[in-house]
Design a protein with these regions (language model features):
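Non-catalytic, low-structured ubiquitin/UBL-interacting segments
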Residues: 1-72, 88, 221-222, 229-230, ...
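Deubiquitinase catalytic domains
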Residues: 148-244
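A general marker of short, structured functional hotspots
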Residues: 1-3, 13-16, 22, 37, ...
Length: 244
């Protein structure tokens, strides 16, 4: 059975390979030109500082980095958009399509009273310390249902943070890794999510840009991959995170 999926009118996956339309025929996208062609879909090469770091960890040096980022949107739902895009790659053959609202609702539906008490308590401590970055007051949230309503509101009301990251990882059975990319503070490091790698889970990698925006990380290997299993995580990322 032929696997065929179109990203755009000019870009498709066929039998595990990404192809682009050149005149009237399709040609395979290669490691030297992937970033030029997939820019039509929104992919671009990962920040130069991360290219340098990952190249240092590579067993085989490549003239063109295979690592890219996808800017999924900047409407306050960027974290949830990134997760949805990665899941859509996983569910492509099942014709299941997620959006940011689905991810918000997924967390809301699985949130327990105990988790709510822990989360809202922590937010109130942050508020007291003038370190709460959201535009709403956690002291105005009086119940789990109040918090769920806030959580499921699209846009800048609730961006998502590392506190809910563990909840989402357990729901999806997926590791979520975050790379800092801050041009202002010159911080290009691993963001510590305080979670250990689970080899039985799949994995998603994100870039956290300038402390305000998430982008999805992908790797080109015959096709762009942004949803990884233990075997498909690139060597450089496994080395960076010390994954055996």
């Amino acid at each position: 059975m032929t696997e065929e999926y179109y990203y755009t009118d000019n870009i498709r996956i066929k039998n595990g390979f990404m192809e682009y339309k050149s005149k009237e025929t399709f040609k395979r996208i290669k490691s030297h030109n992937w970033h030029h062609i997939l820019s039509e879909y929104g992919w671009e090469k990962i920040h130069l500082r991360w290219i340098i770091q990952l190249n240092r960890l590579s067993e085989s040096k490549s003239k063109n980095s295979r690592y890219g980022t996808l800017d999924c949107d900047s409407d306050g739902d960027c974290f949830f958009h990134c997760i949805a895009n990665a899941l859509n790659e996983k569910e492509r053959e099942n014709d299941i399509i997620y959006n940011s609202d689905d991810i918000r609702n997924m967390i809301s539906e699985n949130l327990t009273e105990e988790q709510y008490d822990m989360i809202i308590g922590y937010y109130r401590i942050m508020k007291d310390a003038d370190d709460f970055g959201e535009d709403w007051d956690p002291y105005q949230i009086n119940s789990l249902e109040d918090f769920k309503q806030k959580l499921t509101t699209s846009g800048h009301e609730y961006w998502g943070d590392y506190i809910l990251l563990q909840v989402l990882m357990n729901i999806l059975k997926c590791n979520i890794f975050i790379l800092n990319c801050n041009n202002y503070t010159n911080d290009f490091s691993i963001y510590n999510t305080l979670n250990d790698y689970n080899s039985n889970y799949d994995s998603i990698f994100l870039i956290y840009e300038n402390n305000c925006h998430f982008k999805l990380v992908g790797y080109f290997d015959d096709k762009i991959i942004s949803y990884f299993n233990d075997k498909t995580i690139p060597y450089e990322l496994k080395t960076l995170y010390r994954i055996n």
